[in-house]
Amino acid sequence: MSNNTKYIFLSPHLDDAIFSCSDYISKLTSEGEIVLVITIFSGYPLSQQLQPSAKQFHKLCNLGKYPIEERKKEDRLACERLQCDFRHLSYYECLYRKDRNGNFLYRHIYSELKNEDTLKNDIIKELLMHLDDKCVVYCPLSLGDHVDHVFVNSIGRALEFMRYKVIYYEDFPYVSDSSMVSYMGKTKELK
């Protein structure tokens, strides 16, 4: 039964924490523990023209032109099945983020992480509304070097520096799918 600890799973995208940690989340909730999955990058730029790599990614994943609502629905259903709470933050994932001049920051999802301290601080401020001294925060290891996973990993390290208990989880599919290594190599070559 619950010891008043809240277990918070940081998910870079819709489905990342669920895909990586569903067994453990299910175990926690079945024991009466409080679990909250916070998806960081679940916003979508409805009025923005997509860059070619975003269009290609949508096509590859069969996402359609405006995929976010369907993905949020799937995530809500998964969280309901696992009997955990969820929050969908409205920040954009890397392929949709732009700099101050309106230029896309990242050409592909395996880009090198840029300095986005303002965004990072905004996200941390929003996360702090859900944290207390009894929280355990789960954060991706960023094994596949997806820039958004690396970004969320850096948020985990910042929370750790702030004295929150942070545990890092292996992000699927990167940890188990050898074909992903081949795919990542090809993606890095996209221009």
Predicted regions and their residues:
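Short helix-capping segments at alpha-helix termini
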Residues: 161-164
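Acidic, glycine-rich loop-and-strand cores that form catalytic or ligand-binding grooves
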Residues: 173-174
